[in-house]
Amino acid sequence: YPKKVIIFSPHPDDDVISMGGTFHRLCEQHHDVHVAYETSGNIAVGDEEVIRYCEYLRDVCAKYTEDETVKKKAEEIIHFLRYEKVEGEAEKRDVLFMKGTIRREEARAGARYSGIKSDDHIHFLDLPFYETGLVKKNDLSEADIAIVKKLLTDVKPDEMFVAGDLADPHGTHRVCLNAVLAAIDELKDEEW
């Protein structure tokens, strides 16, 4: 005591949905808590949310900077979402970036509220299997497992909490669980 803990969250909200009270209690008891968001969760963000944030960004930039780069990018994204987007096609990288950024900031706020004091205890893994821009995801790969292994060897946790809803309709929770289990299996002979 205190213990070093990693909470693995498949999406940037599963940590507080699945174990928010425990998360808060671990921090309250002064354990060294890390949270690892395995995917960006970007496709769960609606287009209207992106438009709202882009309008905010555009207006702030117009007020406080003469550089037009960010303002123009925000306007480009707004125009695309309102007039050009074709349902069923993969999202544009800029839109995915905005959606992922919205989820990251929501996750950071939730982690801080739960008691994490330092941003270096909040990890965004962005596992590659998820980043297709579509509901359908890629299969788990060695690249995904390597990212989880690196976090485990960097943090060297005493305890881990892993969300693994095997009934997840899109399979993301299952794939994320399998990434952690595969990484643990590959590291089982390591000592820390």
Where are these regions (language model features)?
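Active-site beta-strand->loop->alpha-helix modules in alpha/beta enzyme cores, enriched
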Residues: 1-12, 16-191
